Each structure stands twice: as structure tokens, then as C-alpha cells.
Amino acid sequence: MKLSMKSLAALLMMLNGAVMASENVNTPENRQFLKQQENLSRQLREKPDHQLKAWAEKQVLENPLQRSDNHFLDELVRKQQASQDGKPRQGALYFVSFSIPEEGLKRMLGETRHFGIPATLRGMVNNDLKTTAEAVLSLVKDGATDGVQIDPTLFSQYGIRTVPALVVFCSQGYDIIRGNLRVGQALEKVAATGDCRQVAHDLLAGKGDSGK
């Protein structure tokens, strides 16, 4: 299996994502780390590092992925490209973790998919790509991983230290609803009193834009 430079950048982002796994994510050290990863990804796209690419290919060969796992990685690469093309100005994100009991996590992923809201994880399971892919695929219905993303920077951006948490964002700012509520109930709270109430109304009506 050969890695494109875009795939390599995504793989490095995921491998390093576990550094953000502590609860105290919004620290100078973590912000500096994220900036370094952003610079590294840009450098890899502009000037390929063949030695680093060879190392990553060796990791993939020694830890082969199943077809479903490859699809999971492809989805992550696609989402990374989309986020680089331009972030949406409004939408919602639902922050979860594998520390949530499986039954509850399955329900949450089903609800976020229903509303078109990305379920956002901080990092990988045991810092391992294959284990993470298998864990996600065991939770989602019909292998549909399109509603799941891994992005530790979003946890830092919105100051998310406990999960689950819903973030609805818009040009006026963002609203955060914390706690184990149904996704629909959390959206209703934002729709009632939030700064981004119109976005929440649209999501409840099935015509909102999901965040990336």
C-alpha cells in the first residue's frame, strides 16, 4: 500500500493526536504542538520528505488495514482536504469519547448522523490507527463512518474538557450545551435562547449545514 502525501499528512495528524488526550488541552504546550503539526503538514504538501514517507509506508506494511479500515482512513483524508478548502461559517459539532459506554455512544452517533452533525473525537484508541478504525466501525450503522471525525484542535478551540458536548456555531459566536442530553434536546435549548438559535432551528428542521 502506497501513501500519498495527503494521506501521510492525515496519518501523522492522527498518530500525534493522542498527545491531546489529556483533559487539560488548552495549554501553551498543546497550542505550540498543534502549530507545529500544522506547519509539518503544510511542509509535507509543499516539499515531500521521502525518508518520512518511507517510514510511514513501513508502518502501514507492518500493520495492514482491512478494506473497511482503508475506507475509514480515506474518509479522514477527505475531511482533512475539505477543512483545508474552507471551514463552514455555521453549523454544529458533537464532541464524544471512547470513554463513554458503548451503548450510549452508539445512540449518540445515531442521533448525530440523523441531524447531520459530525461526531468529533479527540484522538485514536491506544494511539493505534487499526484499533481506532475497528472501534468506530463497530459503533456506526452499516459501516457509515461519514459522520465521524478525529480532530483534537476542535477540542482546544472550544475548550471542551468533558463529553458529551454540543457546539453550535455561527457568525455571532457559538453556544455550548454540556451533559448527557439527547442531541435533539440540546439543539432545542440552543434554539430557545442561544446566540446561534437560527442554526439550531435549521438543524432541527433538517436543513442545516454540518460543521467540519
Swiss-Prot record:
GO CC term, one of those recorded: periplasmic space
Signal peptide start-end: 1-21
Matches recorded under Pfam families: TrbC_Ftype (PF09673)
Assigned keywords, A-Z: Conjugation, Periplasm, Plasmid, Signal
Cellular localisation: Periplasm
Main location: periplasm
Coiled coil: none
Known function: Essential for F plasmid conjugative transfer, participates in F-pilus assembly.
Name of the protein in question: Periplasmic protein TrbC
